[in-house]
Amino acid sequence: MTPDSSPSSVDDPLFESGHRIFANKDLLKIGHVPEADRIVGRDEEISKLAKRLNGAVHGYSPENVMIYGKTGTGKSLVSKHVCQRAQNAAQDGVEIGTAYIDCAEDNTETQAISSLAAKLNDESSTGISVPHTGLSTSKYYKLLWKTLDAQFDSVIIILDEIDLMNDDSVLMKLSRAEEAGKIDCSVGVIAISNKIQYVDNVNERVKSSFQHKELFFKPYDANQLREIMFNREDAFQDGVLSEDVIPLSAAFAAQEHGDARKAIDILRHAGEVAYEAGAELVTEEHVRQAQQHAEKDRFRELVNGAPTQAKAALLALTELSVNSNDDAFLTSRVYDQYEHICNHLDMDILSVRRFRDILKEQAFLGVVEIEKINKGSAGGIHLQNRLIEDSQVVRETILEDSRMQDWTRE
């Protein structure tokens, strides 16, 4: 029985004996992996990924897979779901290990490998102890290899938000471990990124070693978003959701790019807003308040997780927006401001081409909007860039980075 659904009373009057809004709030957690019948609109992606991992079920090598798609399109959920099913489907005598690494948290090679070793190790079975800190990267790799060979025939490793990893050689070392004679166990890597150009920017040796298939996850449409949320309706007590709550939450998420994570986040926040207000029902107004809150959270997460160069590019566009009556600026003008910022912060200045790529990545993430404008036969075609979020909010968020704060001391 979950804590939210428990009907038993508590002795302290400070705390409620149940929850008048939520019945099972865990269904609304971002990392929650639902049962197969609750996963919406991803049958084709599940089937394709399963084919790539099929070798592991029979004791052979799974393939490496690179998954692209915007935030909230089910990339992590489907990866975890298929890995769970592969473990359950393994032939008799075949042991499959799976591990999930969030590269936003474990963003160095040492952190990622030590986390993998700790998550995959069953000390009672292997007799191997994996300390959280204190060892060199090479020693953590050796512990990982020993752990894998002691327990598994195949291992599938999910590296989520791989673009935030500061050393892409981890892809090469994991995918080549068996070939290099480090282990007898087969290793397959599922690398997940919001950035469609990620592989184009990795080291050539890594690119050559990480032989992979690609999957692209399209955004959910409004109908799919509604179905996803109706499948989580039992997270709430019976009768507390007004009939317009789920359609409105889905509509807000569909306006962006079909972000299921955002839709679920809005629904959860709406319940929390209603609870804090002492309401008996979750209403449309609670959803609207939750949407504003979720949008700020989403934006801060995107900007705070961006590399330093991306923050400098966004700061350049932000400064132009704050100090001008215009809201859209040619790439050349934004680049001039970017150069000024980099010089002031003593940062390396990227080429114009790489700078354009960064702006495109931010447009892909929904932070920047890019529009082509035609200045005629003499002027040619140019790109204009504008911030989607309020410029003051963007500026405040970027300046939370200590490296960027020096800009305010100009």
From Swiss-Prot:
Gene3D superfamilies (UniProt xref): 1.10.8.60, P-loop containing nucleotide triphosphate hydrolases, Winged helix-like DNA-binding domain superfamily/Winged helix DNA-binding domain
UniProt cross-references to CDD domains, sorted A to Z: Cdc6_C
Gene Ontology biological process terms from the UniProt entry: DNA replication
GO MF annotation terms: ATP binding; ATP hydrolysis activity
Residue numbers binding ATP: T73, G74, K75, S76, L77, Y220, R232
Domain of life: Archaea
InterPro entries attached to this UniProt entry: AAA+_ATPase (IPR003593), AAA_16 (IPR041664), Cdc6_C (IPR015163), Cdc6_lid (IPR055237), ORC1/CDC6 (IPR050311), Orc1/Cdc6_arc (IPR014277), P-loop_NTPase (IPR027417), WH-like_DNA-bd_sf (IPR036388)
Disruption phenotype: Not essential for normal growth.
Swiss-Prot/TrEMBL keywords: ATP-binding, DNA replication, Nucleotide-binding, Plasmid
Function recorded in the entry: Involved in regulation of DNA replication.
Matches recorded under PANTHER family: CELL DIVISION CONTROL PROTEIN 6-RELATED (PTHR10763), ORC1-TYPE DNA REPLICATION PROTEIN (PTHR10763:SF22)
Family that this chain belongs to: Belongs to the CDC6/cdc18 family.
The protein, known as: ORC1-type DNA replication protein 4
Protein species of origin: Halobacterium salinarum (strain ATCC 700922 / JCM 11081 / NRC-1) (Halobacterium halobium)
Designated gene of the protein: orc4
